[in-house]
């Protein structure tokens, strides 16, 4: 059955997330894309389930601040995204705690720090397992819930690295994983056409702290290849996340929104 047209007509009502439950994985950092996606959803009234892998204190601090500032319910969960059984346990627990999941933002991931030749086989396996297989695990677990309830929105954090091979860093495993995430979203959009929408967001260089270990010379080279001349701020992504989880995007599925300051136009 085709998914219905929303009953709301006003734009603010279409973007509203009041009464909805949104999951955001990888939202334990102080200035990352995950916490900004969660913040955007909280601003629009959503209750939230946010996850962490190792930074429990960071996730709990973020949850406390979101509840205090926006008056929404926020619960924190530890999840090993590379273990399907743990992901399934987590999704079932969220449904038990909140009664439903309306949208799932699969944002958690790992970065690569070596190329194919210089890196180990386990380095490759780790990035692919977390970034691609882990995202697929999230999709599989929440997809079953979406199918049962008859609606849902899955948003995958991909990367501009799924469109281009970044220079000069060697991160083939990451590029491959993120390209896979983009096509995963497109494929699931078709597979889930009767009960859920699936889209991806491909950020460019965003100041989240994850690249702080990169030397300044390399970072200057990155910026020189961005038409807008600067890195992005994580808050510049939250509007896209809110759009894709809300009824404002009710006819959007299989899309990939590139937010990279123009990097991939070169």
Swiss-Prot record:
Show the catalytic activity: D-mannitol + NADP(+) = D-fructose + NADPH + H(+)
Mutant lacking the gene: phenotype: Does not affect growth on L-arabinose and L-xylulose reductase activity remains unaltered whereas D-mannitol 2-dehydrogenase activity is reduced. Deletion does neither affect the germination process nor the hyphal morphology. Only during later stages mannitol levels are slightly lower.
Instruction: Give the residues annotated as active site.
Output: 159 (proton donor), 174 (proton acceptor), 178 (lowers pka of active site tyr)
Identify the InterPro entries for this entry. NAD(P)-bd_dom_sf (IPR036291), SDR_fam (IPR002347)
Keyword set for this entry? Answer: Carbohydrate metabolism, NADP, Oxidoreductase
* Residues reported in the UniProt entry to bind NADP(+): 53, 107, 140, 174, 178, 206, 208
**SUPFAM superfamilies cross-referenced by the UniProt entry:** NAD(P)-binding Rossmann-fold domains
Could you give a GO molecular-function term held by this entry? Answer: L-xylulose reductase (NADPH) activity
Could you give a single Gene Ontology term from the biological process aspect?
glucose metabolic process
Check the record and name the Pfam families matching this protein. Answer: adh_short_C2
Q: Which Gene3D superfamilies match?
A: NAD(P)-binding Rossmann-like Domain
- Which conditions up-regulate this protein? Exhibits low expression levels on L-arabinose and L-arabitol, as well as on D-mannitol. Transcript levels are shortly up-regulated during the initial stages of germination.
Recorded protein name is NADP-dependent mannitol dehydrogenase
């Amino acid at each position: 059955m085709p998914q219905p047209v929303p009953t709301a007509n006003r734009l603010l009502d279409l973007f509203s997330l009041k009464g909805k439950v949104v999951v955001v994985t990888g939202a334990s950092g102080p200035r990352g894309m995950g916490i900004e996606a969660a913040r955007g959803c909280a601003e629009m009234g959503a209750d939230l389930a946010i996850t962490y892998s190792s930074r429990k204190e960071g996730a709990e601090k973020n949850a406390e601040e979101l509840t205090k500032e926006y008056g929404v319910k926020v619960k924190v969960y530890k999840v090993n995204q590379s273990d399907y059984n743990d992901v399934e346990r987590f999704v079932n627990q969220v449904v038990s705690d909140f009664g439903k999941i309306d949208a799932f933002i699969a944002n958690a991931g790992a970065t690569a720090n070596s190329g194919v030749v210089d890196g180990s086989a386990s380095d490759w396996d780790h990035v692919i397992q977390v970034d691609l297989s882990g995202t697929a695990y999230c999709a599989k677990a929440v997809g079953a819930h979406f199918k049962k309830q008859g609606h849902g929105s899955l948003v995958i954090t991909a990367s501009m690295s799924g469109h281009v091979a970044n220079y000069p860093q060697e991160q083939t495993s990451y590029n491959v994983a993120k390209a896979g995430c983009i096509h995963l979203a497109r494929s699931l959009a078709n597979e889930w056409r009767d009960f859920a929408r699936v889209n991806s967001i491909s950020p460019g260089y965003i100041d989240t702290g994850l690249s702080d270990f990169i030397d300044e010379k390399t970072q200057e080279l990155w910026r020189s290849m961005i038409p807008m001349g600067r890195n992005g701020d994580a808050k510049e992504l939250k509007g896209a996340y809110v759009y894709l989880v809300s009824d404002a995007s009710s006819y959007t599925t299989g899309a990939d929104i590139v937010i990279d300051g123009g990097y991939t136009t070169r």
